[in-house]
């Protein structure tokens, strides 16, 4: 990956958009976005996935989703509205910066989940390869809309890398594609889809909703294998 692809948790000189409303619980609302897609159904014959942290504390059960037999996923049918929310938040940021509340030179940071995040959380493992390319196309379309609407030199984009980290630590069931290959290919693709004028970062996280570790692993996992 190019040198501009950082792995810092925060980007110096930026202020992040506020996550409220449906985004208060990060990407949890994407479960319903996927369930509402005409090509996806609830896998009622498959046990729900229990989202729990390392000590067994459980936060919720997630009904598993799958692609309907014979259906074809289409990026045009995915409606996350990330671009709309970012552009709306930008207007407030821009006004506050013009008023001097936010210092000049501070960039507006837009944080987005990777396509792997809702896929690993919600889909049956066998259908991951069907959904990831579709979500990738959709999310890069959202990035393109943001890049066209906002001044690229005044914004920063952050791909939140969480599910990839806990997958690397053995949290998820294996799928048909090795998660290491899937992760590396995905992070490169979504990074390459961000215009060069936009500052880009990849923060790595394995925190639960309780701000504790999801995995019990104490030894850092090498991403160079």
Describe the predicted segments one by one.
Residues 1-155, 159, 167-170, 175-179, ...:
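Alpha/beta catalytic barrel-like cores
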Residues 163:
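Active-site-adjacent pocket scaffolds in enzyme catalytic domains
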Residues 184-198:
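Extended, H/D-rich, highly charged conserved domains that either
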């Amino acid at each position: 990956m190019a040198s501009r692809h950082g792995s810092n948790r925060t980007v110096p000189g930026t202020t992040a958009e506020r996550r409220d409303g449906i985004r208060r619980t990060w990407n949890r609302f994407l479960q319903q976005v996927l369930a509402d897609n005409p090509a996806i159904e609830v896998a009622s014959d498959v046990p729900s996935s229990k989202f729990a942290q390392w000590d067994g504390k459980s936060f919720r059960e997630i009904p598993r989703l799958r692609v309907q037999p014979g259906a074809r996923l289409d990026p045009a049918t995915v409606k996350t509205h990330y671009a709309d929310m970012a552009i709306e938040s930008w207007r407030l940021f821009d006004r506050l910066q013009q008023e001097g509340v936010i210092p000049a030179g501070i960039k507006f940071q837009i944080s987005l989940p990777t396509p792997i995040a809702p896929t690993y959380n919600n889909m049956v493992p066998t259908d991951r390869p069907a959904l990831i390319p579709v979500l990738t196309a959709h999310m890069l379309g959202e990035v393109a809309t943001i890049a066209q609407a906002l001044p690229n030199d005044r914004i920063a984009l952050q791909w939140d890398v969480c599910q990839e980290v806990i997958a690397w630590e053995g949290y998820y069931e294996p799928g048909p594609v090795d998660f290491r290959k899937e992760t590396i290919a995905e992070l490169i693709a979504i990074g390459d889809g961000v215009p060069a004028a936009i500052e880009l970062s990849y923060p790595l996280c394995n925190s639960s909703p309780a701000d504790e570790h999801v995995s019990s692993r104490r030894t850092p996992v090498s991403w160079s294998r």
